[in-house]
Amino acid sequence: QEIGITGGEPTLIGDNLFTLINHIKKVLPQTAISILSNGVKFADKEYAMKLAKCRHQDLQIDIPLFSDIAEEHNRIVGAKTFYKTVQGLYNLALFRQRIGLRIVVHKQTYKRLPQFADFIYHNFPFVAQIAFMQMETTGLAKENFDELWIDPYDYNRELREAVLLLADRGMKPYICLLYTSD
């Protein structure tokens, strides 16, 4: 069994996130927890430490990165969060938390997937997994479909190179493609 905690942004509830984790741990002790977060709040070392103090035996924080270039990540996100996200990753690693990276692939980012993979290898060797995610066409992505959508077939060369680069170096890359009925 697994419980996914997402949002919005789950860390916006502050310390109540730890109350929730501890409650799940008490009531469903064998249940894995997956938290999808932008990672920014974990740039606060104290907050990252509080997560570690929950001592949940099967918890993973999944954090999306949109580029290996700060300006590009910030443009896509719409806020200057790159360096705080990176610091959050380092703080979580400092406290030995299991981390997954989510790399959302779209028209504006696919060309740099091999360089992005190299960046991940050199800067985040501690992550448990790297998931290359096909873009979901919801929310702002749906509104900007023409600027963002690219068929996975059209980026398979770059994706293959990125995945093999990470796998050959002992990391755990995954590919997530979404089924569409169209």
Locations of regions flagged by a protein language model:
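Radical SAM/AdoMet-radical enzyme domain recognition
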Residues: 2-4, 13-133
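Active-site neighborhood of divalent metal-dependent phosphoester/pyrophosphate hydrolases
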Residues: 8-10
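Aromatic-lined carbohydrate-recognition surfaces of secreted/lumenal glycan-active proteins
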Residues: 174
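Conserved small/polar residues in nucleotide/adenosyl-binding loops
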Residues: 179-182
